């Protein structure tokens, strides 16, 4: 992690702000599709601030600059930001949200500007109200992105990668029935159509996959679905011949990506009652999700012309069908085999001093081991390969010229995942190749107990991830410890590794989203000792119905089915802290791992010996 000088960039940006009578300028992380992970061409916030984390918002005034981010990135931001920037640690006591900070800077009649394609319509409305409540002038839409103007010719070009059709043997469902179900929802909500701008929703709905955003098999696009038509806005030259044929077969029209705003304006006008029809005529409305950009909402007619709803596509995508669930099981077995081979190899290299390996070299080896497995497409995010103090940086990103050497005396954390045609993986294991300290063993075991407790939880249908979160934190809480990140996130099926709407954590949003059978989530408690070590244990699990002796309130009861097939680190487990039930759970899990993965290592004595050692009964 490096600090980048931003003085010249900020000076140029402020000049552009003054020329447009803007006193405060907002630079979000997201792209025009509200993507969590973005293409390099959309990395505006990183360019202007120097902060490379995946979450955060930059706000620039004529004499100040602030970067707001969450607890996952406090250490990273503190390292990467130069002295032009104030770090707003979101969620910390007495620290304003970036919206509050922005409104405070606008006090006294000042004007706030933003690129309207990068802020959702709901965020824009809430921010306008906050700005005016503090005596600010207004939030205004600036069509020219000012950071792009500063970036100039050095800005990366927009990717235009091929788009492939995902066959039914992987997707489990064709587009036509997906569209039928969506139209049934729209009919119930009495809206004319639904405008979709979220990339993974479009990829899922049309059974297409791309690579416009690194690690995310999505492509730049929009879609409009009405009772009679489905239109995909995309660069048609990117579509494979098979994709073209599939879309035609499923009655999907294709329009240029750039036409969405012009077509939206035309569509919105066509839905307005004419003078002949009179004001009594029934107004037809379009629906958008709460992630739709302010710019697109304005093109569709703004308030009164559209209804903002919870995306029915997002909800449907989160409930995996049986084909997708079986794909998740199978890809995690193959992925587990790759990780087991990697950890056995890495321990042999490090503990026996066969080679000097840094964090990047180790991560490259892991990618190569994954790549040999069936249906491998690529990684699902940049591998977090972190040793010692680097492991305490929650979203650490190793770089070749500055990363650390892996040694046998420090904790090693590996958070990694892959994209397979039949599913998406995400696994974290923390290991030690020598003799860990008692503090490290205790911390690891407390995290492990939380991981197991949540995995073993049984709960009534309707329970949210917010309610389940304490299962994972309870043992750390008993010691006055905690971690600054969520406990779980939804996972896509050969889609984004972070997928809504579900999650497990303390965010208010999770209190309104019940977990349901077919959901796939991570379970990943952790503990981080700044400057020393970090521990995280992550499994992927599927929500399923379970049998219980009783069914209070006639509600089904739910539980988890874990699909990650990688053993925990025996050296780091303090058995004296485990209950008999926890030991039995570990034994059952280890037997399952051994049964599912040992077939990959018939001719690999090193890996097989490591696997048998790590899965011995407790």
Swiss-Prot record:
Organism: Pyricularia oryzae (strain 70-15 / ATCC MYA-4617 / FGSC 8958) (Rice blast fungus)
Co-factor binding comment: Binds 2 manganese ions per subunit.
Binding site for Mn(2+) 1: 426, 524, 538
E.C. number(s) listed in UniProt: 3.4.11.9
Keywords carried by this UniProt record: Aminopeptidase, Hydrolase, Manganese, Metal-binding, Metalloprotease, Protease
Gene of this entry: AMPP
Essential cofactor(s): Mn(2+)
Reactions listed under catalytic activity: Release of any N-terminal amino acid, including proline, that is linked to proline, even from a dipeptide or tripeptide
Protein name per the record: Probable Xaa-Pro aminopeptidase P
CDD domains per record: APP (cd01085)
Function of the protein: Catalyzes the removal of a penultimate prolyl residue from the N-termini of peptides.
Keyword Hydrolase: yes
GO biological process, one term: proteolysis
Record-listed Mn(2+) 2 binding positions: 415, 426, 538
Domain of life of the native organism: Eukaryota
Family that this chain belongs to: Belongs to the peptidase M24B family.
Molecular function terms, GO-annotated: metal ion binding; metalloaminopeptidase activity
Any single GO CC term annotated in Swiss-Prot or TrEMBL for this entry: cytoplasm
């Amino acid at each position: 992690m490096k600090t980048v000088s931003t003085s010249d960039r900020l000076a140029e940006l402020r000049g552009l702000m003054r020329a447009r009578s803007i006193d405060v300028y907002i630079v979000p992380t997201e792209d025009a599709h509200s993507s969590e992970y973005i293409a390099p061409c959309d990395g505006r916030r990183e360019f202007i601030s120097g902060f490379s984390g995946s979450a955060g918002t930059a706000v620039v005034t004529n004499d100040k600059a602030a970067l707001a981010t969450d607890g996952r990135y406090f250490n990273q931001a503190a390292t990467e930001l130069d002295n032009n920037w104030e770090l707003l640690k979101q969620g910390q006591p007495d620290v304003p949200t970036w919206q509050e900070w922005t409104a405070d800077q606008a006090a006294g009649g000042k004007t706030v500007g933003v690129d309207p394609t990068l802020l959702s319509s709901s965020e824009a409305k809430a921010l306008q109200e906050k700005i005016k409540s503090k005596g600010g002038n207004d939030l205004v839409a600036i069509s020219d992105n000012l950071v792009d103007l500063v970036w100039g010719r050095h800005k990366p070009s927009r990717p235009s990668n091929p788009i492939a059709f995902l066959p039914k043997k992987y997707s489990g469902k064709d587009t036509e029935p997906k569209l039928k179900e969506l139209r049934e929802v729209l009919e119930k909500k009495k809206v004319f159509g639904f405008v979709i701008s979220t990339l993974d929703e479009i990829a899922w709905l049309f059974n297409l996959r791309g690579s416009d955003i690194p690690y995310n098999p999505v492509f730049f696009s929009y879609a409009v679905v009405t009772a009679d038509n489905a239109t995909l806005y995309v660069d048609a030259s990117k579509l494979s011949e098979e994709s073209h044929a599939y879309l035609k077969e499923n009655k999907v029209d294709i329009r240029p990506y750039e036409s969405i705003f012009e077509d939206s304006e035309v569509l919105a006008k066509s839905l307005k009652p004419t003078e002949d029809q009179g004001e009594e005529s029934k107004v037809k409305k379009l629906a958008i999700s709460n992630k739709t950009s302010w710019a697109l909402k304005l093109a569709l007619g703004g308030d009164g012309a559209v209804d903002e709803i919870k995306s029915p596509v997002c909800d449907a995508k989160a409930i995996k069908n049986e084909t997708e669930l079986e794909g998740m099981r199978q890809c995690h077995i193959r992925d587990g085999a790759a990780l087991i081979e990697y950890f056995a190899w890495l321990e042999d290299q490090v503990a026996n001093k066969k080679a000097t390996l840094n964090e990047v070299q180790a991560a490259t080896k892991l990618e190569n081991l994954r790549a040999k497995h069936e249906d491998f497409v690529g990684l699902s995010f940049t591998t977090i390969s972190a040793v010692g103090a680097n492991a305490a940086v929650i979203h650490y990103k190793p770089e070749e010229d500055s990363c650390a050497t892996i040694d046998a005396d420090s904790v090693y954390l590996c958070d990694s995942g892959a994209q397979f045609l039949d599913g998406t993986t995400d696994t974290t294991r923390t290991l030690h190749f020598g003799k860990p300290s008692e503090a490290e063993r205790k911390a690891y075991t407390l995290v492990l107990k939380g991981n197991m407790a949540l995995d073993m939880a049984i709960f009534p249908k309707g329970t949210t991830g917010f309610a389940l979160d304490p299962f994972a934190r309870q043992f750390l809480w008993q010691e006055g410890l905690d971690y600054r990140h969520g406990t779980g996130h939804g996972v896509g099926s050969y889609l984004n590794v972070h997928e809504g709407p579900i999650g497990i954590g303390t965010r208010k949003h999770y209190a309104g989203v019940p977990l349901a059978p077919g959901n796939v989530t991570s379970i990943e408690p952790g503990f981080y000792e700044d400057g020393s070590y970090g521990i995280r244990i992550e499994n992927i699990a599927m929500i399923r119905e379970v049998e219980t002796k009783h069914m209070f309130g006639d509600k089904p009861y739910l539980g988890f089915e874990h699909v990650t097939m990688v053993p925990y680190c025996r050296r780091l487990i303090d058995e004296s802290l485990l209950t008999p039930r926890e030991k039995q759970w570990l034994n059952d899990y280890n037997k399952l791992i051994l049964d599912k993965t040992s077939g990959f290592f018939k001719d690999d004595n090193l890996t097989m010996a490591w696997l048998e050692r790590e899965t011995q009964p407790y």
